[in-house]
Amino acid sequence: MSDSVDTTVDTTSSRERIKRALSHGKKGRINKDLSNKIMLGVFRAAAYITTLVLVAIIAYVVINGLPHISFDFIFGWPQGVNAEGGIWPTIVSTVYVTALAMLICTPIAVLAAVYLAEYAKQGKVVELIRYAADALASVPSIVMGLFGYALFVEAMGLGLSMVSAALALALLMLPIVMRTTEEAIRAVPRYIRWGAYGLGATKWQVVSKIVLPSAFGRIATVIVLAIGRAIGETAVLLYTMGQAINLPISPLDSGRPMTVHLYLLANDGINMNAAYGTALLLMAIILAFNLFARYLSRKRH
């Protein structure tokens, strides 16, 4: 009996404190209105600052890079010690190494995500795998570049090549694609699985015919975003791909991606016009992939 009385007293006192805190008196109403306006202004300023930073970066790159964009710049070859001419070989190298990296990364990441989400028994081993993936995702790209150089370039004897860069880039993208794909698979409603099991479907039939098609939109969005990030990587490619300006044909050929080309131009200061033009094209490509991912996300809903 005493416990119920104490509970009633505590509840009543809590209500009184809430009423006093939310007093509807004139002074309390003024204070609440003022605090609401202040916090609304703070939130709005934070949102505007974020947007303005992006707009400022885009405007700066466009203003400095757009005058140097031309057909010859996009489809021409760099010439001379000042890297005059175009950047076509760097575009080809970027597409080549990114495509190769995603071809390596995507199947492994999706299969691992399916295992973790659908087949693995939840326990310490699975938690350890997830922790390892999260830790791998947090490794700085320059560290991954050094690791790729030591393993693929030196130990495996692949040299500074497309395949060395693609393998290192795939390792960098693997945990990101795997974890987000796992979340996409887990987002598929359970009742869809239960309905399929109720009709006599096997585990593999449920996964291949129900779960993966239902999660395809989310998985595609994840892959597109990963491609956009891979295109913007520099440190990994700088240590594993080399700097040769040529059109790579074999995976064992070297090359120079756009990010490395931009880094060398800006770092040496030999041709800032070409650097700004390269930055503009690189930014446009990455923004295009981000917009495409956003389109896929909206289409899914």
Feature locations, PLM:
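Periplasmic/extracellular loop-to-transmembrane helix junction in inner-membrane transport proteins
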Residues: 22-45, 60-101, 122, 260, ...
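Interhelical loop and adjacent transmembrane-helix boundary motif
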Residues: 81, 85, 237-283
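Transmembrane alpha-helices
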Residues: 180, 203-239
